Regions:
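C-terminal motif of bacterial Sec signal peptides marking the signal peptidase cleavage site
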Residues: 15-18
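Bacterial signal peptide processing site
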Residues: 20-24
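N-terminal substrate-binding region of glycoside hydrolase catalytic domains
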Residues: 45-159, 298-301, 309, 334-341, ...
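Substrate-binding cleft of secreted/luminal carbohydrate-active enzymes
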Residues: 49-74, 177, 292-391
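Aromatic- and acid-rich polysaccharide-binding/catalytic face
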Residues: 86-96, 238-269, 336
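Substrate-binding cleft of extracellular glycoside hydrolase catalytic domains
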Residues: 99-222, 356, 366, 379-380, ...
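Glycoside hydrolase catalytic-domain groove-lining segments
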Residues: 107, 111-128, 246, 256-303
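Aromatic-lined carbohydrate-recognition surfaces of secreted/lumenal glycan-active proteins
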Residues: 209-235, 288-302, 332-338
Length: 391
């Protein structure tokens, strides 16, 4: 899959929607035994639990938070697939700062956060400093394909009132929030500006901090269909994409193609998508930051077709959960249950039905995986680091 075909979810003033394999040695993660009660870590927390990195809202060492994606009608079908004790602990939504199709409505945003809280879910909110997303063909025709407004956010005040609205809404909410600022930052489908994006990220974080907002953890998110230049710096030392350890609480990564999570690590022109995944995870470890998988789904497989569902489990889900098991810095995952053929952005690119509710026997495999004691569900959010400060 090329970068152009990897589209983010259509953004909204409030939307409650809501890579080519190359040559090289084939490598995949090896899952350790993960049926025992987790433990270990270095930092103490509530009830004397320990935390590997000590990050805000990090789960105890050895635990992985179970989260859900962003389409309400599909989320409703996901709930009965799992027992009450294994319901998701977080839910993803998208906000676009410059959406021109829908009115800006802070009250609606506040209501969405409250609705998630009522279900026992921590909001994972994508704050996108851009407007409406063009289709790939339209993007190719733009005079300036860097169409996002991150440069305007970084260098002016035009969007400050909307950003301040978010500051006020999140502060009034008082409960834990993960804020993913400009998710999939280096993907050309988002149109963000190198060197300007990290300045916009820093400005947004500093607006929250200036207002005394301390119930928000800030998330920096990559997608491996994009170039692997996330750690690149210019001659003066400025980062092309990385906002800095002082404003990033969590690293994040999104997975859709099977080549993102296993396979060759190199291609004819350098690293493969999986190689870029491992490079990004290594950067997170070096920075001593936990990782949240903010979006994930097996977009190449139709789960409504038994043969494809079977292939999806062996080629996507099994390597996915093995990667999580083999990389302890991954502390949180979000599954997007959705029939991508119903969304014009995705249907045109060949994305398929990833609604778990139609996947038949595979549901039992998924439920069995989430029954392992390492997964942290809605009933256990009080175990997250610092969670008790924001009840």
């Amino acid at each position: 899959m090329t970068a152009l075909t990897r589209l983010a979810v259509p953004l909204l003033a409030l939307t409650l929607a809501g890579c080519a394999a190359g040559s090289g040695s084939a490598v995949g993660p090896t899952a350790p035994g993960d049926t025992t009660t987790p433990g270990g870590g270095t930092t103490t927390g509530p009830t004397n639990l320990s935390y590997q990195f000590g990050a805000k809202f990090e789960p105890p060492a050895g635990r992985v938070v179970h989260g859900l994606g962003q389409w309400k009608e599909y989320n409703l079908k996901y709930v009965p697939l799992l027992p009450a004790a294994h319901q998701p602990a977080s839910e993803l939504i998208f906000l676009s700062i410059a959406d021109s199709l829908r009115p800006w409505n802070p009250a609606q945003i506040a209501a969405a956060l409250a609705a998630m809280d009522a279900l026992g879910r921590i909001p994972l909110v994508d704050i996108a400093p851009r407007g409406n997303q063009p289709f790939p063909a339209e993007l190719a025709q733009l005079a300036d394909p860097l169409y996002a407004i991150d440069d305007e956010v970084a260098n002016g005040t035009k969007w400050d009132s909307r950003l301040q609205d978010l500051v006020n809404v999140f502060k009034a909410f008082r409960k834990p929030v993960l804020a993913r600022i400009g998710g999939e930052f280096s993907g050309n489908w988002n149109g963000y500006h190198p060197y300007e994006y990290p300045k916009a990220f820093r400005k947004i974080v500093n607006m929250f901090r200036a207002a005394g907002v301390n119930n928000v953890a800030f998330v920096w998110c990559y997608e491996p269909a994009a170039p692997g230049d996330f750690d690149e710096q210019n001659a003066s030392g400025a980062y092309k994409w990385y906002p800095g350890a002082d404003v990033v609480d969590w690293f994040s990564i999104d997975f859709f193609a099977k080549g993102d999570i296993s396979g060759p690590t190199s291609a004819h022109n350098g690293l493969s998508a999986y190689g870029r995944t491992l490079k990004f995870l290594d950067m997170a470890v070096a920075a001593q930051k936990p990782v949240v998988i903010a979006e994930s789904a097996p977009e190449q497989f139709d789960l409504a077709k038994p043969a494809e569902a079977t292939a999806a489990w062996s080629e996507w889900f099994a390597p996915y959960f093995a990667l999580i098991a083999g990389r302890p810095e991954i502390k949180w995952f979000t599954y997007v249950t959705y029939d991508w053929t119903q969304g014009s952005y995705y249907a045109s690119q060949g994305w398929k039905n990833n609604d778990l509710a139609v996947s038949g026997p595979m549901v039992a495999q998924y439920a069995a995986e989430l029954a392992k004691p390492k997964y942290l569900h809605a009933s256990e959010t009080s175990l997250l680091k610092d969670y008790a400060l924001f009840k």
